[in-house]
Amino acid sequence: MSEEAEQQQAAEYIAYLYDQASALRQYIDTLQKNLAEVLESLEAVRASKSAVDEIGKENQEYLLFGDRKGNIVFKVNSVDKNKVLIHLGLNYYAEVDPQAAKKILDDREQQLAEVSKNIQGELSKSIDAYNQIAEILSQVQGKKGE
């Protein structure tokens, strides 16, 4: 193989590695966003479980947020301690006793923790692959400079 052909092949391989690194970077960004969403959902489930635990306490005043941003908050003195509404998915809710709600929330927490673990594993593998490609590209760049 001629030197020119070898240089052409090397250039194509470098371009291929660069494309792979770019694709991995996008994939890593997507995984990080997905992980952040899952962790946010996990925290919301834990907060909901804590709220269910608070229902059983006597003589408590509750704050009910009118929206997600807290633009309006209602003080509530009386809450039915025997029933809660729990979101089942899509636009479905069920009225259940607090213990059933805790069971549903425990299951949801376990599912989200498993999803988080899987995403973190995939993220770790992707970052390792990206770093390996970046190292190769860095070495190639260093050899070009010599």
Curated annotation (Swiss-Prot):
<dbReference type="GO" id="GO:0051082">
    <property type="term" value="F:unfolded protein binding"/>
</dbReference>
<keyword id="KW-0963">Cytoplasm</keyword>
<dbReference type="GO" id="GO:0005737">
    <property type="term" value="C:cytoplasm"/>
</dbReference>
<comment type="subunit">
    <text>Heterohexamer of two alpha and four beta subunits.</text>
</comment>
<comment type="similarity">
    <text>Belongs to the prefoldin subunit alpha family.</text>
</comment>
<dbReference type="Pfam" id="PF02996">
    <property type="entry name" value="Prefoldin"/>
</dbReference>
<keyword id="KW-0143">Chaperone</keyword>
<dbReference type="InterPro" id="IPR009053">
    <property type="entry name" value="Prefoldin"/>
</dbReference>
<dbReference type="InterPro" id="IPR004127">
    <property type="entry name" value="Prefoldin_subunit_alpha"/>
</dbReference>
<dbReference type="InterPro" id="IPR011599">
    <property type="entry name" value="PFD_alpha_archaea"/>
</dbReference>
<protein>
    <recommendedName>
        <fullName>Prefoldin subunit alpha</fullName>
    </recommendedName>
</protein>
<dbReference type="GO" id="GO:0016272">
    <property type="term" value="C:prefoldin complex"/>
</dbReference>
<comment type="function">
    <text>Molecular chaperone capable of stabilizing a range of proteins. Seems to fulfill an ATP-independent, HSP70-like function in archaeal de novo protein folding.</text>
</comment>
<dbReference type="GO" id="GO:0006457">
    <property type="term" value="P:protein folding"/>
</dbReference>
